[in-house]
Amino acid sequence: MEILETGNIPLSTNNPRGGINLHCNLENSAASQQSHHWMSGGRRLQFFYLAPASVLSLPTGRNFVKVITGRLDNIDRSCLAPPFSVRSTEVRPEKVSTGEETALIALMTLTENAPEILDDIAQLEFQGEECGELRWETFHERFGAFLDAFEGQDCHMANGFHLLNENDTEVAYVNPWVCGKGVDLSTHNHANDPSPMAPAFAEVHWVLASGTRTGGMYETSEPGSRERTLHPMILGQEHGPFYDRDMQGLPVFRKNGAVQYPWHGWQGGQDDSPGQRYDYVWAFEINPDYVEACI
C-alpha cells in the first residue's frame, strides 16, 4: 500500500470528550485503511489499519511506528514492550508488513524541517484535517478546577484521537501532551471510577520529542515519596506496561472496574541549557478488551 494524498478512514468530531474520531474497519480484514495526516512540531503523524498480508511503503525520512493492536511481521513488533522496559520504535526498512494478523499502527515521520528542540508550544500546533479540535491548553486550564498541582507549571495537553471500530467502540484514545523541564506531572494510579467520559484503559507512552533526554516515567511507593525508579525515554521510544497483570499477562482490575496501576508519573528532565526544552509525548489509552497479553 502506498500512502495516499487524502486518507480513507472516515473522521468525525462529535465525541463528547472532544478530539477527533477515526472510524476504522477493524473487522473488515480484507481492506487496509489510512487516515489523513497531521503535522505537529515538524512531525508528520498518521494512523493505518493493515489487513493480513499487507505491505505499507514508508515515507522518505526518519520513521517511527507505534503498534496499537496486532503485529507487524517483518519487524517482529506488536503493541507492548516487556513490562517496565523501554524500547525504540524507529523503523529502518523502507516498508512494514503484516503476516496472518492485522495491525493498527501510528506512524511518525520526522520532516527535514523538524526542530531538534521544541521550546515553544506554538511549534506544536496541529495542522491538518479538523485541526481545530486538537487545540492545546495548559494542564492547569484543563484540571485546575479540581487540582492545583499544575498552577504555574509549563505543561500542556491537547484533545486527541479516538480510534473506533465499526460499532463505534473505542479501541484506543491517543492523548497528546507536553512537559517542560523539571515539571512533575503528578504521582497517580488511575484509580478513579471509570465512566463514559473517563473509561478504564491500559496505558503506554510514545515519545515524539525528548527535550533533555533525561525525562521519563517513574515508579514510586506513594505520592510524596522521595524514592523513585526513573525510566528515562528519548525520541521514538515507548515503554511496556506499568499496570498490574494476571497470570495470562492481561490487565488486573480494581473492584470499581479501573485497571490497577502502581503509583507512577512522568518527570520532566533537567539540563543546564537556557530556555525551555519540551518532552512531547502521546499517551495510548488502550481499551483493556483490545490490549495484548504481556507476561
Regions found by a protein language model. Name each.
Residues 56, 65-70, 105-106, 174:
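Hydrophobic beta-strand residues in large extracellular and virion-surface proteins
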Residues 62-74, 198-220:
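Short, conserved beta-strand element in jelly-roll/cupin
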Residues 163-168, 196-198, 266-267, 273:
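Short, conserved, surface-exposed binding loops centered on an aromatic residue
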Residues 57-61, 98-101:
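Flexible, charged surface loops at secondary-structure boundaries
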Residues 47-50, 69-99, 219-269:
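Short acidic-glycine-tyrosine-enriched beta hairpin
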Residues 100-123, 129, 205, 240, ...:
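A short hydrophobic beta-strand segment most commonly corresponding to one strand
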Residues 1-52, 90-93, 99-176:
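A short, N-terminal "cap"/entry segment at the start of jelly-roll beta-barrel domains
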Residues 41-59, 175-200, 217-223, 240-247, ...:
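Conserved short histidine dyad/triad with adjacent acidic residue
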